[in-house]
């Protein structure tokens, strides 16, 4: 289901880096039904599992994007976990460049990196999904009233969007995303970095139904606008039981490097705690 079709990407959600890489080995590469993946032809590794290196952090140069987690916009406990993650990365042999500065993070509002094209993409998607269905457009969804009240305004706002070819906002977004891509690439080149690091979220998870507490979602700040790959790995817990993540972002086609970094970090820190609601599976299942 499209949300931002020009930014959306399907990736594995898994218990461990090993599991995520096993899935990635299957889904990575060119898909004729997804034109965006055409650029990956000739760039896919024969196997990504070979980059699972327990010593993968050693020698990596990692830039810290503190603009995404200042004391003013980040939960104090998340800050502590991030500082510990940086200490762990240093202990594992990484060279930490702290901080690095990406001017466009300050000059481009986060919302101006996304074109609201949902209406056009969902109107294209639904008829192809089920040609005989009664609901074929966003307008049909709105008329049905079969949606959560919390998203009603957003649905009406998306329905009011002008055609993409006439949408001035989307034209500006296209320019902004190019600026952000070039800025991130330049910072990495200027500092000879292998990857950038920052907390995936600046605040702990919110309670279900809480739409007002700050959430501080950093995961879409750099990766979707640039198209560069990123991997999140657990970096501990806050409030005893709420997980927080470390996001590691690299250049285009740098998945092998990212896998080395996150696997080495995961194996050395072992932050994951299986939830009590999901007991271990018997061996081989």
Segments (PLM) and residue ranges:
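General small-molecule cofactor/ligand-binding pocket signal
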Residues: 95-100, 231
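Sec-exported extracytoplasmic/periplasmic mature domains
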Residues: 25-32, 87-94, 115, 123-131, ...
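Conserved acidic residues
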Residues: 194
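Small-aliphatic-rich amphipathic alpha-helix that forms the alpha element of a beta-alpha
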Residues: 183-186, 210-234
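Structural helix-boundary/capping segments
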Residues: 1-63, 71-72, 83-90, 225-285
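Short, surface-exposed loop/helix-turn segments at secondary-structure junctions
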Residues: 37-43, 167-171, 191, 203-221
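Short helix-loop capping/hinge segments that flank enzyme active sites or metal/cofactor-binding pockets
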Residues: 49-67, 116-185, 234-243
């Amino acid at each position: 289901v499209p949300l931002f079709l020009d930014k959306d990407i399907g990736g594995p959600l898994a218990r461990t880096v090993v599991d995520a890489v096993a899935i990635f080995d299957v889904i990575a590469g060119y898909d004729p039904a997804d034109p965006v993946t055409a650029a990956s032809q000739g760039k896919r590794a024969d196997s990504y599992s070979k980059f699972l290196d327990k010593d993968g952090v050693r020698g990596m140069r990692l830039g810290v994007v503190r603009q995404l987690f200042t004391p003013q916009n980040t939960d104090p406990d998340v800050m502590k976990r991030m500082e510990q993650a940086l200490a762990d990365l240093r202990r594992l042999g990484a060279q930490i460049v702290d901080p690095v500065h990406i001017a466009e993070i300050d000059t481009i509002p986060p919302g101006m990196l996304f074109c609201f094209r949902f209406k056009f993409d969902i109107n294209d998607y639904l008829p192809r999904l089920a040609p005989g269905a009664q609901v074929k457009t966003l307008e049909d969804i709105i008329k049905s009233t079969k949606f959560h009240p919390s998203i009603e305004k957003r649905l009406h706002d998306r329905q009011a969007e002008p055609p993409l070819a006439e949408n001035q906002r989307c034209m500006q977004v296209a320019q902004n995303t190019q600026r952000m891509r070039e800025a991130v690439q330049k910072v990495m080149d200027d500092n000879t970095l292998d990857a950038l690091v920052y907390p995936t979220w600046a605040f702990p998870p919110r309670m279900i139904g809480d739409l007002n507490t700050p959430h501080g979602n950093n995961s879409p700040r750099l990766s979707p606008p640039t198209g560069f790959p990123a991997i999140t790995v657990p970096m501990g817990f806050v409030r005893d039981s709420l997980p927080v993540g470390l996001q590691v972002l690299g250049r285009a086609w740098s998945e092998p490097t990212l896998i080395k970094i996150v696997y080495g970090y995961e194996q050395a820190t072992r932050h994951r705690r299986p939830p009590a609601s999901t007991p271990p599976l018997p061996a081989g299942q």
